[in-house]
A protein has these predicted regions:
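Acidic, metal-coordinating catalytic segment for phosphate/diphosphate chemistry
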Residues: 2-38, 42-46
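Short helix-to-loop capping/linker segments positioned immediately adjacent to catalytic or ligand/cofactor-binding
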Residues: 14, 90-94, 110-114
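Conserved Nudix-box catalytic region and its N-terminal flanking loop in Nudix hydrolases
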Residues: 23-36, 45-85, 89
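A structural signal for short, well-ordered beta-strand segments
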Residues: 37-39, 68-69, 101, 123-127
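Short, catalytically relevant binding-site loops at active-site mouths
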Residues: 56-58, 105-108
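Nudix hydrolase/Nudix homology domain
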Residues: 63, 75, 106-184
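A short coil-to-beta-strand element that immediately follows conserved catalytic motifs
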Residues: 94-104
Length: 184
């Protein structure tokens, strides 16, 4: 987590309040609600989901498996642009297509992890990639492409090895018609 990065504080409906704060200082017990995003990247050729293992050096949730990419839009940055920026930085994916918001009002707060707490208004997106990832080792330990059913099995079989938000989003995505339609 970089202290130089800024997060955008939002109200209960996800509207920016006009305030921003340093990313690291904005993930404590006094964390204000701020804007994030979560993205599930599907491989265009076979519709498999890109699942990533967070780098062991990460301050938050190191070594756990999660969805494809997450992050925070910078002040004034469109979420789709932030998704592309983080996918390029974390995964080496220069091109993402058809970015769609499937859970526009998703919000979560994590239990403390070494003093760090997530309190995010975090819309969930789906995007498509045609290229193979080239992960940044500072961000991603490993990755794999899985059918949605195998991802569901992984969440059930290894819940302690999965990110908090991945486990929290799964039941919502299963009931989300736009997402389910993409998985067919």
């Amino acid at each position: 987590m970089s202290e130089a990065e800024q997060v955008v504080f939002v109200d209960e409906h996800g509207n920016p309040t006009g305030e921003v704060g340093p990313k690291l200082a904005s993930h404590t017990a006094a964390t204000k609600l701020h804007l994030g995003f979560s993205c599930y990247i599907l491989r265009r050729s076979d519709n498999k989901l890109l699942v990533t293992e967070r780098a062991l050096s990460k301050k938050v949730w190191p070594g756990v498996w999660t969805n494809s990419v997450c992050g925070h839009p910078a002040p004034g940055e469109k979420v789709a642009d932030a998704i592309r920026r983080r996918a390029a930085y974390e995964l080496g994916l220069a091109q993402l297509d058809d970015i769609q918001c499937v859970l526009p009002t998703y919000r979560y707060t994590t239990p403390p992890y070494h003093g760090i707490i997530e309190n995010e208004f975090c819309p969930v997106y789906v995007a498509y990639a045609s290229d193979e990832p080239r992960p940044n080792p500072e961000e991603v330990e490993a990755y794999k492409w899985l059918p949605w059913s195998a991802y569901a099995d992984m969440l059930r079989a290894e819940p302690d090895n999965m990110s908090y938000w991945a486990k929290d989003q799964y039941p919502l995505l299963r009931l989300c018609e736009p997402f389910v339609a993409l998985m067919d």
